Amino acid sequence: MRADAASFVPGKGLVADSEVTKTRRDAAPELSEAAKRLPTYQKKDWVIAGIRHNVVTVISGDTGCGKSTLIPQLVCDAENLVADDKVVVCTQPRRVAAITLAEYVARDRGQELGDEVGYQIRFINKFSENTRLIYATTAIVLRRLHSEPTLDSIGCLIIDEVHERDVYTDFLLLLLREAMANGRMPHLKIVLMSATLKAEDFAQYFRKVNGDTALKPVHIPGRMFPVEDYYWEDACEWIGFCPQEKGKGGKGGKGKKG
């Protein structure tokens, strides 16, 4: 199977405007108590308001605040934010992250993976016609742009870990900015999520798209759990053994001969 063989499958078609609110509200499950304790949940109204107001919304928040798991759900469940014939896609720079996040969110919502929440990585598509939220690698979305230049099947594209600045993400941001500035994606909302406070740089990059009335980046303070940095020396101390560095002598090393 080619990586670009499968499309992002939207919902079951267009519905009348008067039915959109009812359909979304009835279909959205109650968020779990664990999700409601996340710092992101406390800022949910600000987050949704920012996405409604802006074409491109920039969100920053500490690692562990719930950006990757909760914001895609909030967007998917919000009333009249994403049309029922379109999906919400959240990109991840790595395949493992796309899979584990999709599994966690599906389990948190009490659903089977591939039903309302799914994922798409190279050669593997785990979603159905009922899927509303798809976690996908950034490379997959780039391939989608090649076959679907205006991303008509996507209502909101969330680009996570944008601060990592890998080549796929940078290229995707460039293509999106040019397409939206030229009016080729009038239906699309874009959300950029960063774990650093340099969100203003990304907001400035998309100023041409958002215009002068754009809201400032949304910052989510706080994290659920403390994050500590550990290094190689710490691991050596824990296990009571430190492998000899390559090139420092020993059987397999390239140290100087005596």
Residue ranges of predicted features:
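P-loop NTPase motor module signature
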Residues: 1-258
